[in-house]
């Protein structure tokens, strides 16, 4: 009577067919023109957001006026939020796509290079948000009337009213 040795699935080197994810509905590959254009467009959007913040003097320290009237601040808030949302949507898509390669193949140098590039963009987006929150803190008295007027400012209002101290000190 012979007994066949039982194979432990946790220690077996035969993994069978490994799962594959089809991400071609997002981008066709890491080195495709469409992904490179998306990364380039993201850089352009983040640069434009920096220019927007500079042009409108949006920062905690750049505005010498202690408070700005709601009629002047609302279009600035809406403009910032529209631009940021557009950049964040693209950043999230590209970052998730690249991360799917890095997490499944840590030796993929193209994916690692793109991940590093995207990390720098992510830091810039965070710095822009800190700058914007600081400015929102300088106009906190105008926020209620700005939020009542609707639009992107109202849609995101709870983000900036729940933590007013953070907006002032960021």
Over which residues does each language-model region extend?
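A well-structured
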Residues: 1-170
């Amino acid at each position: 009577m012979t007994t066949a040795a039982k194979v432990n699935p946790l220690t077996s080197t035969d993994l069978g067919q490994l799962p594959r994810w089809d991400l071609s509905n997002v981008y066709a590959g890491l080195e495709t023109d469409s992904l490179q254009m998306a990364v380039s467009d993201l850089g352009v959007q983040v640069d434009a957001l920096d220019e927007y913040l500079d042009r409108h003097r949006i920062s905690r320290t750049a505005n010498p006026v202690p408070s700005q009237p709601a009629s002047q601040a609302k279009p600035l808030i809406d403009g910032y939020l529209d631009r940021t949302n557009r950049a964040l949507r693209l950043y999230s898509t590209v970052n998730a796509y690249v991360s799917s390669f890095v997490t499944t193949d840590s030796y993929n140098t193209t994916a690692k290079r793109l991940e590093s590039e995207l990390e720098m963009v992510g830091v810039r987006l965070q710095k822009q948000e800190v700058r914007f929150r600081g400015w929102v803190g300088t106009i906190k008295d105008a926020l209620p009337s700005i939020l009542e007027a609707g639009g992107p400012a109202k849609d995101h209002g709870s983000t900036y009213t729940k933590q007013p101290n953070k907006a002032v000190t960021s």
